[in-house]
Amino acid sequence: MGLPKGFSSQRKRLSAVLNMLSLSLSTASLLSNYWFVGTQKVPKPLCGKGLPAKCFDVPVPLDGGGTNASSPEVVHYSWETGDDRFTFHAFRSGMWLSCAEIMEEPGERCRSFLELTPPTEREILWLSLGAQFAYIGLELISFILLLTDLLFTGNPGCSLKLSAFAAISSVLSGLLGMVGHMMYSQVFQATANLGPEDWRPHAWNYGWAFYTAWVSFTCCMASAVTTFNTYTRLVLEFKCRHSKSFRGAPGCQPHHHQCFLQQLACTAHPGGPVTSYPQFHCQPIRSISEGVDFYSELHDKELQQGSSQEPETKAAGSSVEEC
């Protein structure tokens, strides 16, 4: 039941790719002004030259006499009623700015979303921004840990530690991102109902940045699950291998590393202290990663001892042949 090394590295690469994708999407959505899009209902200006309003003029004399007066006052009447008296301008809003079309000239007018937010909702907006920054920061930390595990780690114990910390960072960042998205949605809905009269949207919907943020959250949680799965498989493989090593001594299972050292002491130096492994004597293992470090180093020591004993064995064999 060993875990193939290539399979483990593939899962680590998948976690790193998902984390990088989540980091890119979350950064793009944070900087975008397309969280919400819609239209604003703006009254048309009064009748005048160059304006598209449907108006007609009725001259009214100033002295109240007939229509042939020398200086009549002109009264403007419009045929438009209902929604025809308004224009609908497109607008877009994000965490930083809210921009809308203007009637006088082509272009947009942008205002700070913080200024549009009601005073009672500004604290929630600041919390939302803080959660978004923490979300991106933890994602960046998780990506660095996964990249370090892929490129520079050959020690299985260190790999376990990096995988565990990367998974925890991904989970925390995903939770903070979810909270930040929900808080900003609540702030926008309150601003749409209680904001300035000249800004309140007539109709609005979610923009591409909103969906991008939730896709980023999904990728972040998928990366966390994949990293946790890799960590669990490594731990199970470690336990399986070393349970086979101590299957012959069932009474020593609670403290199998100490019993293993005692067996080495008895087999290597009967009746004497252990001289080959002085640094491992009576050291309890407090975690899985320490156990992996312990057995990895112990295995290296055994290989070194075996390689040093081979020349002695060959020399002894040659001396016997000469005799």
Swiss-Prot record:
InterPro entries: GSG-1, PMP-22/EMP/MP20-like. The keyword Transmembrane applies. Disulfide bonds: none annotated. It is found in: Endoplasmic reticulum membrane. It is a multi-pass membrane protein. Keywords: Endoplasmic reticulum, Membrane, Transmembrane, Transmembrane helix. One of its GO terms (cellular component) is endoplasmic reticulum membrane. Pfam families: GSG-1. Coiled coil: none annotated. Signal peptide: none annotated. It comes from the Eukaryota. Residues 302-323 are annotated as: Disordered. The chain crosses the membrane at residues 17-37, 133-153, 164-184, 208-228. May cause the redistribution of PAPOLB from the cytosol to the endoplasmic reticulum. Belongs to the GSG1 family. Interacts with PAPOLB. This is Germ cell-specific gene 1 protein.
